Amino acid sequence: MKILIDFFPILLFFGAYKAYDIYIGTGVLMAATLIQMGLIYTLDRKLTVMHKITLALILVFGTLTLVLHDERFIKWKPTVLYAAMAIGLALAVWVWKKNFLKLLLGSQMELPDPVWMRLNMVWVVYCVFMSLINAYVAAYYSTEAWVNFKLWGYAFPLVFIVAQGFYISRYLKTDEPKA
């Protein structure tokens, strides 16, 4: 159910774009994201900071796209989101000496501090990469190619997270008694 809720807006955006155009797709994306956040809030009784930032960016860039009738705004939303994540994760470590990943996930798993630091840096690099690749596709390819990239590009985070799972599993402490 959670995966369906996560992919609900992008699937509707893709369908609306294919059936109509980028502007109808953008309106559908905005409405679907509002519904998505309502569902998440109803189920979890909270929205994470990431949910709030994503919602704000979709509404701001979507509104600019629709009001100015300029598709470049919605195409740049992922670039801005990933760049903001990279900057936030990097500044947290280098300026405030805080590891946001550890703060967010530390209660769910116990890992050595160097592992948390490597994970944080890998996320910074990943977010920079995703920001740059989206900027490149948005700037140099057609809108149709960008929309297809957005839909099929969801494989990038899935592969990235699975790879992290394998990396993390080596460091997770188990409660099993040693023989």
From Swiss-Prot:
Gene Ontology CC: one annotated term: plasma membrane
Keyword Cell membrane: yes
Location in or out of the cell: Cell inner membrane
Topology in the lipid bilayer: Multi-pass membrane protein
Keyword entries, A-Z: Cell inner membrane, Cell membrane, Membrane, Transmembrane, Transmembrane helix
Transmembrane segments: 22-42, 47-67, 76-96, 121-141, 149-169
Entry similarity comment: Belongs to the YciB family.
PANTHER family: INNER MEMBRANE-SPANNING PROTEIN YCIB, INTRACELLULAR SEPTATION PROTEIN A-RELATED
Protein name: Inner membrane-spanning protein YciB
